[in-house]
Amino acid sequence: MWCDGAKALAIIRRAERATWENPDMSTYWAMIATLLCVAGGCSRQGPPGPELATSATIKDLMDAMVDPSAEYLFENIVEIVDEKGIIDKTPKTDDEWKEVRRRALMLVEAPNLLVAPGRKVAQPGDKAEYPEVELGPEQIQKLIDDDRDAFVRRARRLQDAAVLALKAIDARDKAELFSKLGDVDKACESCHLHYWYPNDTRAREAAKEDGVVD
């Protein structure tokens, strides 16, 4: 049986003293000490803990994290052209850049939460807000469960786009940020078209024109 860490340490100390007294045994004791260090380390490792609970639903995370962060970025990383000229709404101060970065970081990490095992689409009893064009939570859940790998790939597409947007923010490269936020928008719309409103023909045609889907 493996000894615990404290016993292993005591034996290692005795091995060190024995090595001083008999240098010819140094290699032997070094091997023993190494094995005991490994054993001691292993004995301190407890069993894996329980999985974390997933109380929030995908809808909860979309409402609390993804939608507000994406909308903030789309509304504040923009140049508006009207009859008066160009209105630049991009960040200018350090505080504005920090807020933009905070929102982008939400989009980087949200996909990790969305794909967590056991995460449900919505709370029991939730209904589609516009059932004439939207799928219900049960239908969306079935689409995800039937091909979970595809759901993970779509979430990763959002994450990858958000990571590049975050890099542009850190570089304060506005042109690159405009471009990468376009990719974020496409990733969002692609996922929505597949799971949320796949039967909305007008949205799908618009998405094809914008290069969101083939």
Where are these regions (language model features)?
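C-terminal motif of bacterial Sec signal peptides marking the signal peptidase cleavage site
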Residues: A39-G41
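Short, Lys/Arg-enriched N-terminal segments with co-localized hydrophobic residues
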Residues: I12-D24
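Sequence context surrounding c-type heme c attachment/ligation sites in exported
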Residues: S43-R101, L105-V108, N112-D214
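Sec-dependent signal peptide recognition
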Residues: S26-A33
